[in-house]
Amino acid sequence: MSSFDEDIKRSIWEGKIPIVFTLSPDDLTSHLSPSPYTLMAPRNSYFPLITSLVKDYFSSSTLVLLDEMWLEYRGIPLKWHLPIGVLYDTIVGNNNCNNSNNNNNNNNNNNNNNNNNNNNNNNNNNNNNNNNNNNNNNNNNNNNNNNIIMEQPYWNIVVHFQSYPDRILLRCPNIESVRTYYKNVLKEANFIKQGDITKINNLNINQSNDLWDGLKSHDYDKFWSVNKKLIPNSNKEYKNIPIRLIINYKPPIQELIPVFDENLVELTLENLFSRIPYESFSNFLNYNNNNNNNNINNNSPPLSPNSNNNNNNNNVDNSIENSLNQTNVESAEPEFSNLLQYIKATNAEYKIQGIQPSLKSSAVWLYEHFGHPDNFLYIVLIDPSQNNNNNNNNSNNY
């Protein structure tokens, strides 16, 4: 692996999200609310691995029940078993897109208004802007870095220590529960990747511990010293690329995606999308418009974290999906054959580790560099209908 590729992997690993944790008013045991707790959370980690400090911080303001702690964002319980970055892209990604669009629209409106002002005002504004720019250019690199960080809004999360929503979320009584879940998903990904789990079974106890400790402590070198052993030596050793497509906080969609096509040409991201049939995710797009907001406001549970794909919904999930389908029947729903056609026709955005790679990117290269610690490549689809709904309801403040 080249030093360039190594730098990319390390940069992806070091990606972080600024989070503000606020204690739920229902959990207060005193009249004084504690100040929020801020944290830079690694995208590739899991909430139970980083929230021990949050528990300690709020312990003086509430009765902390360790096995009852859960997190919520705008009425949505956060699934602890998904990587933090995947949760952020799935739930907050729509709002980020909307805020950018709104800011652009506001800027355009302001520009139009400014154009109607007289020339003297315009000249004064330009001079002031130039002076400000000159002053800004004299700032040091630290200030520039701070400006970059501040461009990303904080993720405001509410912390609860009672009334655990176990109809929605898996129980997580301790860190060992996270390790067990992680190990099971890791085995699943490697079975998809190579047709067996021999490489995982061949890890000795020290290597298994280093893999877990590297993830838990967010230690890139320790984690990758073991995880690299789970990567095939060549592209020809792959059976399939382990991917998970996430749409509207529904259970992951998993399709068997080979590295090469029938002509032994490496698949690109564009080819990958063309191999995901529209019918495998079309029902998930019904979770939109007012029905989406109504379900969130009524605290209706999202799909169960026990589900590994769209065919394994539990009874709660089925009842929700049936009610959504009944109220979201479209008389003239457009027909698409696959995900690629849907993306191009609707200009839908997709996120992998928080960015949108080119459709011409090699699928296996993305997997090896943008993959997550559980050895899956998570692709988050931003549903355009969800964006429009949020715009119409002005629900962009978070």
Curated annotation (Swiss-Prot):
Gene Ontology biological-process entries: aggrephagy; autophagosome assembly; cellular response to nitrogen starvation; defense response to bacterium; macroautophagy; mitophagy; phagocytosis; piecemeal microautophagy of the nucleus
Membrane topology category: Peripheral membrane protein
Region annotation Disordered: where it falls in the sequence: 99-147, 292-321
A Pfam short name: ATG5_UblB
PANTHER family assigned: AUTOPHAGY PROTEIN 5
Similarity comment: family membership: Belongs to the ATG5 family.
Protein name, per record: Autophagy protein 5
UniProt gene name: atg5
